């Protein structure tokens, strides 16, 4: 098979937190397939399913815009090169304006082509270039998403954590406009966004939203773990099922202990709000952005560091 590169080992280490030699062995066993290598490490008990990269390295801001009335919301990430610029008022103003303009855009390209909100003689792209010239750093709109309640009643709300490093956008549906305007319902939308920010492993609202292929992957991983290999099949199946159920709940928002009251789950909180509002209320979807997630600083020498330790030229 092809030689395992230092870059592949680096990628696997970032995704799992496993040791270098374990990562190298996993990649050899799976012929360089990173996703299969992750599962191999998990089966060996070396990698945690919830491990996130600890080498996220990009500056900038994650910000949000909620249209008055709470029917349209935006989550946006804009990157720069240093924290110094990220804290600059001109950069912050630019990001705020871009978040508002992204409410009517369907792609980064279409956003860049819009007339700029503070000067219609400029496009957004030209306004960004002017800011680059003024601040002396590259600035890029990395991504954004917008939620719009066009044919539904409900609330869109958001939460920004740690000074613009983590942001969450949440959509919540109600049966009526009166329900959407209910203070308890509006608080639920904000608290749900805060909950998602506090639970980095949560990826879905409920178990029902988890794709079948994700469930099957978890089953394959749990079934292949060595600690149950010698147990009778019926016992093994029960252990696997229990572990899968636990793992799936770790991925879902409604199954989390509520951050403001650990004695209840988020699902319990939703039920309480339904009772107070007198109608059905449901958390529909959410998106979480973590600043710089998956981006490496240009000056990082981590791959070279790995190569040196592996003896790779």
From Swiss-Prot:
The record's annotation in CDD domains points to:
UBA_EF-Ts
* GO cellular component term of the entry, any: cytoplasm
Q: Which domain of life is it from?
A: Bacteria
Localization per Swiss-Prot or TrEMBL = Cytoplasm
Q: Which Pfam families match?
A: EF_TS (PF00889)
Name one molecular function that GO assigns to this entry: translation elongation factor activity
UniProt key word Hydrolase: no
The segment annotated Involved in Mg(2+) ion dislocation from EF-Tu runs over: 82-85
Q: Tell me the InterPro entries matching this sequence.
A: EF-Ts_dimer_sf, Transl_elong_EFTs/EF1B, Transl_elong_EFTs/EF1B_dimer, Transl_elong_Ts_CS, UBA-like_sf
Q: Which UniProt keywords apply?
A: Cytoplasm, Elongation factor, Protein biosynthesis
Q: What is its main location?
A: cytoplasm
According to its UniProt entry, the function of this protein is described as: Associates with the EF-Tu.GDP complex and induces the exchange of GDP to GTP. It remains bound to the aminoacyl-tRNA.EF-Tu.GTP complex up to the GTP hydrolysis stage on the ribosome.
Report the HAMAP family cross-referenced here: EF_Ts
The entry's family comment says: Belongs to the EF-Ts family.
Instruction: List the protein's name.
Output: Elongation factor Ts
- This chain's source organism reads Trichormus variabilis (strain ATCC 29413 / PCC 7937)
Q: What is the lineage of its organism?
A: Bacteria, Bacillati, Cyanobacteriota, Cyanophyceae, Nostocales
Q: Which gene encodes it?
A: tsf
